[in-house]
Amino acid sequence: MTSDNQKDAIINAVNTASDAWKSAFNTGDAAGCACQYEDNAVMRADPFGTFTGIEEIQAFWQNLINDGFSDVEYVQPSIEVIDASSAVLKSGWKMNKAHGVIHKELWVIQDDGTAKLREDHFEAQG
């Protein structure tokens, strides 16, 4: 069982990492986006495909940034703590040229107490 203090720490770590990802994207820093993922993370970006590992994930975000996408915001995000070392974030999202839904961001607490994405499944709907 996860204590309230553990849950708060996990939620804080996820919020900090998620904010860092959004800030990196909005400033055109694809490497900053990619460093929020674990080395072997899997990102499923519907309808674009599945990307595995930091290199593929960074290339995906760099492509979007190069195409002029920016200003990402999460709409009504929710975070559910799964266990003592992970949580799932779900949310709507919007940016200047697209919008959609985050079906599952699996954030895992690292040895240093920070959170990184192990799984990222989102969908562009327009």
What is each PLM-predicted segment?
Residues 2-32, 42-126:
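A beta-strand edge to alpha-helix "cap/lid" segment located at domain peripheries
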